[in-house]
UniProtKB/Swiss-Prot annotation:
Record keywords, A-Z: Hydrolase, Metal-binding, Zinc
Protein name: 5'-deoxyadenosine deaminase
Assembly with partners or alone: Homotetramer.
Cofactor note: Binds 1 zinc ion per subunit.
Taxon lineage: Archaea, Methanobacteriati, Methanobacteriota, Stenosarchaea group, Methanomicrobia
Family to which this protein belongs: Belongs to the metallo-dependent hydrolases superfamily. MTA/SAH deaminase family.
Length: 413
């Protein structure tokens, strides 16, 4: 496949008339006047080629619950609405929700997502069918102790797949015992996979934990020896200065989800301070049930402007830093060999620059973070075109099936 005459961003500058040659699932060459290797040629004039974006924390099947429970705080939202409905979920519902979520990710140029949920075999199969990458972990709760027995078989089944990266997903310190957390850590270390956990998301959660344990959730995990560079900790909203130092010292990756945190009134994560201390911060949307979309570009803008306002300095978290959160920082967190360069995985999106929000052509990174509206034109993952000129094959069928599943779930209330 040859992508011809695209524009790319290199060291902050816009380079035009660049060809990108793809062989198999890798980029084999980036340059000018490249010769095609087959009949597949994409005319990318007036298009910006960007590397595949990463959604670093979500619950993709919960796209099926978009708009079901709004305007509530986290714990009542979970206990009164989400968990009762989730108890009625069937594997087919999760499959439909995942495929619906994948449609949305593909439209926004996302080629990899990090997920924690139920029915992970169905999630993995649906993700693979849709053609994108998933870092997938079955959620672990003490209220469902049998779930941990599924972790190793899932890892063994999927660890050699080229799109699926199995991981271990203890839900949070308030839903997992010390034994569960240590078992999760042991499994992750033995199989060399990532750990995905919610951490210090709400003030009530942290205050309750401190009152019970006389230490913060971060200090507790540190005392257990749980924290390391394999951990991706979602949210990290309520942190002490000591917590931040611990996360930095242990090279923990943080998945920042600003819109969900704002909508659930959970708070504003100290992202600028985390970055100043050297913490690798990525970007996620959380689930569409609490966001309510999977628009990673919207997430970038909100992440930037909220930090500027909360810190009181407009220079905090500039556009290029936010862009890295959705790309390079996530590649590091999930060990992804991605980027628009020779030898990288062929994951990229083509975005039409002939749109009002990209004119005048000044800083394209600024436009992507602060101005971007709409969707990509092409999304390519692992060398396969998933969306061509705004069209995704089979989209109508996926939408109809998701609607049917939702209506059945609601009818059983």
């Amino acid at each position: 496949m040859l992508i011809r005459s695209a524009s790319i961003i290199r060291n902050g500058s816009l380079l035009k008339n660049i060809d990108i040659l793809i062989e198999g699932n890798r980029i084999s060459e980036v340059g000018r006047d490249l010769r095609p290797n087959d009949d597949e040629i994409i005319d990318a004039r007036n298009m910006l080629a960007v590397p595949g974006l990463v959604n670093s924390h979500t619950h993709l099947a919960m796209t099926l619950l978009r708009g079901y429970a709004d305007d509530m705080e986290l714990i009542p939202w979970l206990q009164e609405k989400i968990w009762p409905l989730e108890a009625r979920l069937k594997p087919s519902d999760v499959r439909a929700g995942v495929k619906l979520g994948c449609l949305e990710l593909i439209r926004f140029g996302v080629t990899c997502y990090n997920d924690m949920y139920y029915f992970m075999d169905e999630t993995a199969a649906a993700t693979r069918e849709m053609g994108i990458r998933g870092v997938l972990s079955g959620v672990l709760f003490d209220m469902r102790p049998e779930f941990i027995n599924d972790v190793e078989p899932f890892i063994k089944k999927w660890r050699d797949d080229d799109l699926i990266k199995p991981a271990v997903g203890p839900h949070a310190v308030y839903t997992c015992s010390e034994e569960t957390l240590l078992r999760a850590k042991d499994i992750a270390e033995r199989y060399d996979v990532k750990i995905h956990i919610h951490l210090s998301e709400t003030r009530d959660e942290v205050d309750t934990f401190v009152n019970q344990r006389h230490m913060s959730p971060v200090e507790y995990l540190e005392n257990l020896g749980f924290l390391s560079e394999r951990v991706v900790a979602a949210h990290c909203v309520w942190l002490t200065p000591r917590d931040i130092r611990i996360l930095a010292e242990r090279h923990v990756n943080v998945a920042h989800c600003p819109i969900s945190n704002l909508k659930l009134a959970s708070g504003i994560a100290p992202v600028a301070t985390l970055i100043e201390h050297g913490v690798n911060v990525c970007l996620g949307t959380d689930g569409a049930s609490s966001n309510n979309n999977l628009d990673i570009f919207e997430e970038m803008k909100v992440a930037a402007v909220v930090q500027k306002c909360s810190v009181g300095r407009s220079a905090i978290l500039p556009a290029d830093a936010v862009w890295r959160m959705a790309t390079e920082n996530a590649y590091k967190a999930f060990s992804l060999d991605m980027g628009i360069r020779r030898g990288a995985l062929a994951d990229l999106a083509l975005i039409n620059m002939r749109r009002p929000w990209f004119i005048p052509v000044t800083s394209m990174i600024s436009h992507l973070v602060y101005s971007m509206s709409g969707e990509a034109s092409y999304t390519i993952c692992n060398g396969r075109v998933l969306m061509r000129d705004g069209v995704i094959e089979g989209e109508a069928k996926i939408l109809d099936e998701a609607q049917r599943c939702y209506e059945r779930l609601i009818s059983e209330e």
